[in-house]
Regions:
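Hydrophobic alpha-helical transmembrane segments of multi-pass integral membrane proteins
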Residues: 21, 197-206, 260, 267-282, ...
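Compositionally biased, charge-rich terminal segments
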Residues: 144, 149-174, 402-412
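Active-site-proximal binding-pocket segments
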Residues: 249-250, 254-261, 267-296, 300
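Conserved catalytic motifs of ABC-family nucleotide-binding domains
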Residues: 278-328
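Soluble non-transmembrane domains of integral membrane proteins
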Residues: 1-163
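Terminal, Lys/Arg-rich, intrinsically disordered segments and adjacent short helical elements
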Residues: 215-259, 308, 325-371, 375-432
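Core alpha-helical transmembrane segments of integral membrane proteins
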Residues: 166, 171-233, 265-269, 273, ...
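Residue-level signature of catalytic and energy-coupling elements of molecular machines
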Residues: 23, 207, 231, 264, ...
Length: 432
């Protein structure tokens, strides 16, 4: 009309998930600076766990300053945002697949909509409204329609691999996954095609690396076990006076050279690894569709029994890997209780509460993840029992007694001095 003509060309590359689109306007559009873009996509439900798939589906985007952001993941409400900064790329992300649009010339005045779908046929309803600036009356766009495969995504565009959620950047979880777990995972894939065996090998490698920390934790707990009778005697001596009991206990720790946190700190060192795996296994597409033992798909939950009803917070299926994980946690807690000073009050029952809570929490999680945690707990349990055979508690007791003699006239620590001052202040206040 009026001599106006739009030319649209597509280029499909062999062995690639990318499509290039070029749009050219002829001279009849000489007053046109921008093209309006509107893209709608309603991805079909693809995975076994519909709720989890919806929770993993959202819109991701990267602005011109390389700031990555996204709409709220697990929301059951309609989400939308207006973005003033120009954008480099936008992705409709599902759990294991994405549809993305990438522009070298940036998207302007973008509006993103993620609309909740109540049924099970579609995951969500995604909409993009944006403007693209014309350069010489043309624009070039790249589309990516493919898997959330880290190896592929990192080659597509700047920070495009962030479409795979590998954990928090701020506490180093994503960094650990990128530079430690993914290289280990890719290396182990060279030796076997069984992803169940790859998970087993990952556990062995990681347990080997952190064995010195596990051993240090065991030694610290063994010292606390030897010291426990004296701690109990102090508690009985100052029953009803917690401050005096704490002050004398701290003095005992100082004289014996035993740290009450010695057994905790090495264990805390392992927490980032467990958290990293929590994001790693469920988000790596390599596990999708991979069977192992009774699990048909390591990317979703395993089910050995379908229930004719739904248990609140549990579900309508029974995951055997989750049960095994819960049992392994109980074994770990029992061993730790034997090594540590006896617990009192509600803490005594905490060791039973945690496995039950994990049973409910992890029942619908990836079977690959619960299998990994089960193996990790069993490996740790085995290590601790091996350490028991090599740790001589009588030698530890002799070492503690020797430290007592060395430190009999040692000065109080600054913490002990402050604690004594606080006790005296409280006693003076009570006298008044």
């Amino acid at each position: 009309d009026n001599g106006k003509k739009i030319s649209i060309k597509y280029q499909i590359n062999d062995n690639s998930y990318q499509i290039n689109q070029s749009i050219t306007l002829n001279e009849g559009f000489e007053d046109t600076d921008f093209i309006n873009l509107k893209w709608k996509n309603k991805p079909y439900h693809q995975e076994l766990n519909t709720n989890n798939e919806k929770n993993q589906s959202t819109i991701n985007y990267l602005d011109e300053n390389d700031n990555f952001d996204y709409l709220d993941y697990p929301s059951t409400e309609d989400e939308s945002i207006e973005i003033s900064n120009p954008i480099k790329w936008i992705s409709f992300k599902q759990q294991y697949f994405i549809s993305s649009i990438i522009s070298n010339d940036l998207f302007y005045d973008s509006k993103l909509f993620s609309l909740h779908e109540k049924g099970d046929e579609f995951v969500k309803d995604f909409i993009i409204e944006s403007k693209i600036k014309l350069i010489n009356n043309s624009i070039n766009l790249d589309y990516y329609f493919g898997p959330n495969d880290y190896k592929i995504l990192k080659e597509i565009s700047t920070d495009f691999d962030k479409n795979i959620y590998l954990g928090f950047e701020t506490i180093g979880v994503r960094t650990f996954n990128k530079y430690v777990l993914i290289p280990i995972f890719n290396f182990l894939k060279n030796f076997t095609e069984s992803y169940g065996l790859i998970i087993l090998l990952m556990v062995i490698v990681i347990r080997f690396i952190i064995t010195p920390f596990t051993y240090k934790s065991h030694i610290s707990m063994a010292k606390m076990k030897v010291l426990n009778p004296e701690i109990q005697a102090i508690r009985e001596k100052h029953e009803g006076d917690m401050q005096k009991s704490q002050a004398e206990t701290m003095e005992l720790y100082q004289k014996t050279g035993v740290s009450p946190l010695g057994g905790c700190l090495p264990i805390l060192f392992q927490m980032p690894i467990l958290i990293s795996v929590f994001y790693f296994i469920p988000n790596m597409i390599e596990f999708r569709g991979q069977s192992f033992l009774w699990a048909n798909d390591l990317s979703t939950y395993d089910s050995i029994l379908r229930l004719p009803f739904t248990i609140p917070f549990y579900g309508s299926h029974v995951s055997l890997f989750t049960i095994l994980m819960a049992i392994s946690i109980m074994l770990m807690n029992k061993t730790n209780m034997q090594m540590q000073a006896s617990m009192e009050g509600p803490m005594k029952y905490f060791q039973y509460f945690i496995p039950i809570m994990m049973l409910f929490f992890f029942n619908s999680f990836s079977s690959g993840l619960t299998y990994y945690y089960f193996l990790t707990n069993i490996a740790t349990y085995g290590q601790m029992n091996i350490f028991k055979k090599f740790v001589d508690e009588s030698k530890i007791k002799d070492e503690i007694e020797l430290n007592k003699k060395k430190n009999v006239n040692s000065k109080k620590s600054s913490f002990q001095i402050r604690l004594d001052e606080a006790m005296k202040a409280k006693q003076n206040k009570n006298k008044k």
